[in-house]
């Protein structure tokens, strides 16, 4: 019996399954089983409601982002600040106008005060100057008006200083006024301030005189000839023949002092001006000459002795001025007991001589004739 019941049950189950095939299915939307958690979460209604809530949340978030409290707070004060700034600007305009008006008034007042003070100071200064001038004119011996020259005849001359035979006269006497230059002579318009003839005669032969002693002038035999031995530092004297003189060396001779180029290491020294330049110098053909004593530059040899360096270089028998005994440099003149000449070329040309040597020679002849 049990064996028969089992297949009958199976047949019933199969029949039920066949019946279930033709049963109309119920859609998920019409399901009312809200208690089932799976049905509630998997249903379309729940999905739709979930999407709608998410969309609403997104909308609210976007609205919060676009129209959040910060944006609203930023926009509303901006409108209020514009109105406030306009009101402030309107309120400042009359205040600024009033300030500018007050400043302009104060500036005008300060300008008027400054001009008044300036005029008052000028008036006081003029009054003080007039008072001082009146007091100065009241003193006895004061001059009235401006004299054109300091050395006019109206002024008392200072007595001449006596010169004793044992004391050398001063070559640069004390000045009573500023030296007369070209600019001052143009301003003054007269040459009365030039030295007098007596003073010129007194200083005229100072260049050719010997040193004074207690007994009188020193003779040439009494002059102390200082014989100094030639040291090992002295450069050897090299006599260059005329054949070794090149055209480049002749072209390198300076005709003007402005053409000189100074060089301490490569230049050669001129005996007259003691300047070390790179221009061509003379070469003494005297065997007894030594060192750089026979080297003279172009301007010095022309202005001092009236000779040319090119002619001296091409002359095989040319001797330098120290070897001839006519050197007028400061060292040689001091060795001979005479004073230095200084820049004497302009005075020599003023008296009609072309060089200093000719001028000194004429002075010496005049001095010997008077003596």
Swiss-Prot record:
Cross-link (Glycyl lysine isopeptide (Lys-Gly) (interchain with G-Cter in SUMO2)): 204
Subunit structure: Interacts with MYC (via C-terminus), YWHAE and YWHAZ.
Principal location: nucleus
Residues annotated with Phosphoserine modification: 142, 190
Name of the protein: Cell division cycle-associated protein 7
Residue stretches spanning the membrane: none
Residue numbers spanned by region Mediates transcriptional activity: 247-371
Organism of derivation: Homo sapiens
Further comment: CDCA7 expression is correlated with MYC expression in lymphoblastoid, lymphoma and breast cancer cell lines.
Documented effect of changing residue 158 to A: Does not affect phosphorylation or interaction with YHWAE and YHWAZ
UniProt function note: Participates in MYC-mediated cell transformation and apoptosis; induces anchorage-independent growth and clonogenicity in lymphoblastoid cells. Insufficient to induce tumorigenicity when overexpressed but contributes to MYC-mediated tumorigenesis. May play a role as transcriptional regulator.
Keywords from the UniProt entry: Apoptosis, Cytoplasm, Disease variant, Isopeptide bond, Nucleus, Phosphoprotein, Transcription, Transcription regulation, Ubl conjugation
Post-translational modification: Phosphorylation at Thr-163 promotes interaction with YWHAE and YWHAZ, dissociation from MYC and sequestration in the cytoplasm. In vitro, phosphorylated at Thr-163 by AKT.
Region feature (Interaction with MYC): 146-170
């Amino acid at each position: 019996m049990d064996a028969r019941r089992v297949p009958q049950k199976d047949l019933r189950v199969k029949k039920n399954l066949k019946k279930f095939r033709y049963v109309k299915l119920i859609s998920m939307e019409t399901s009312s089983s809200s208690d089932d958690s799976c049905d509630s979460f998997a249903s379309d209604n729940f999905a739709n409601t979930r999407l709608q809530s998410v969309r609403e949340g997104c909308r609210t978030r976007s609205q919060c982002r676009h129209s959040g409290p910060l944006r609203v707070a930023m926009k509303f004060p901006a409108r209020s600040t514009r109105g406030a700034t306009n009101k402030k600007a309107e309120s400042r305009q009359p205040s600024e106008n009033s300030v500018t008006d007050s400043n302009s008034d104060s500036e005008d007042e300060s300008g008027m005060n400054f001009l008044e003070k300036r005029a008052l100071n000028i008036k006081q200064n003029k009054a003080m100057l007039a008072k001082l001038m009146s007091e100065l004119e009241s003193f006895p011996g004061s001059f009235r008006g401006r004299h054109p020259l300091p050395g006019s005849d109206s002024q008392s001359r200072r007595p001449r200083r006596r010169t004793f035979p044992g004391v050398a006269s001063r070559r640069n006497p004390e000045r009573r006024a500023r030296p007369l230059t070209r600019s001052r002579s143009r301003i003054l318009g007269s040459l009365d301030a030039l030295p007098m003839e007596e003073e010129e005669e007194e200083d005229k032969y100072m260049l050719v005189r010997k040193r004074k002693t207690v007994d009188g002038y020193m003779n040439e035999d009494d002059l102390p000839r200082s014989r100094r031995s030639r040291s090992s530092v002295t450069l050897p004297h090299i006599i260059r023949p005329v054949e070794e003189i090149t055209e480049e060396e002749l072209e390198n001779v300076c005709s003007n002092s402005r053409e000189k180029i100074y060089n301490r290491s490569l230049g050669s020294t001129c005996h007259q001006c003691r300047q070390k330049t790179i221009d061509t110098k003379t070469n003494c053909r005297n065997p007894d000459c030594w060192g750089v004593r026979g080297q003279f530059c172009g301007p010095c040899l022309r202005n001092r002795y009236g000779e040319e360096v090119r002619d001296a270089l091409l002359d095989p028998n040319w001797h330098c001025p120290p070897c001839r005994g006519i050197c007028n440099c400061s060292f040689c003149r001091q060795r001979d007991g005479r004073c230095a000449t200084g820049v004497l070329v302009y005075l020599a040309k003023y008296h009609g001589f072309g060089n200093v040597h000719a001028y000194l020679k004429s002075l010496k002849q005049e001095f010997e004739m008077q003596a």
